Amino acid sequence: MHELIESKGVPIKAWTNGVPVEPEARKQLKNIAELPFIHGHVAVMPDVHLGKGATVGSVIPTKGAIIPAAVGVDIGCGMAAVMTNVTASRLPDSLKGMRENIESVIPVGQASHKQPPRRAEAAWYQRHKAGYEAIEAKHPKIMEKKSAALQIGTLGGGNHFVEICLDEADRVWVMLHSGSRGIGNRIGQYFIAKAKEEIEAAGLKLADRDLAWFGEGTQTFNDYVEAVGWAQDYARSNRDVMMGAVLAVLRETWPDLETSDVAVNCHHNYVEREEHFGERVWLTRKGAVRARKGELGIIPGSMGAKSFIVRGLGNPDAFESCSHGAGRAMSRTAAKERFTLEDHLAATAHVECRKDPGVIDETPMAYKDIDAVMAAQADLVEVVHTLRQIVCVKG
């Protein structure tokens, strides 16, 4: 069940029972709720925390406007997961080689492919090149770096990951988390700056400059919708190509590996035209997953906690949404100051993963309790599978 957060604007309905919400995040949510074009109310997921531009874990319905900073710069960031026919009994004694093999085919961090693999090249030419060129013709500054074709099938950094997991029946799953990489970042930054320029030129004063918007019917609105739609499609392809590469690596160990019908590829940072409460609106999910009735989604825990394949319950008050993970309990800086490498080693003892100072900001203790997050959204989703990580590749 949700609780109400009071605001001077539309109601804020928050699925946060038993989950802490920072005062700064509450303030940010109230700023969103006071915008003049919010439709009905703002929904807040239990993994909510302070974000850049808008609150992570918020679902924002708008009429006649889109806020580029609410979508953010990792446009189309999301998850993919597939179940295989392989079981835990067939795992090798050491999983280090499996992790290294995945790292050999998936560039991580800032890295790109030096030469795109066939899957990536096919995706670029068949699905993305024409749209890229159309955006480039109108906004050449976005496309100054020619990395987009070389970054399909690459992971990125931060909280992006590739994981090998086991479910409740000890079946092997592949799960990964990534978005639109450098090109999505440039599209986001470019249009966020444009929106701020337009609002300032109009003489409008905002409680938060990051909440600048494009009004529907303007050229910049249309250009943003075109560019953000392209980036969201690119992000989905990025996950598809990575999934294909990981499965190919696993087939070197298990030539008879097959995938089941249970496969999910879902965004959690995006904007889309949807119908809610009888009205067509622009719905921005900022760190939230669509959870229509019967629809499968993915809610990952941290790199040491369990994750969930869920089925949506189609809750209308949540705009048919659920959380996109556990949610950070503290900032990356705070995590680095608070936790030691020894803390991280203890928390990830059961996972074959990076165990160095470079990933302490992603240590499990930096995230909220995933069980509390799931309990808070029991009326949004039901759990179909529970996954535990055994291999984790981080950017």
Residues of each region from the PLM?
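Domain-length cofactor-binding catalytic modules of enzymes
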Residues: 2-28, 37-42, 52-56, 60, ...
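Beta-strand elements of modular eukaryotic interaction domains
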Residues: 33
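A generic, well-ordered mixed alpha/beta core segment in the N-terminal half of proteins
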Residues: 69-134
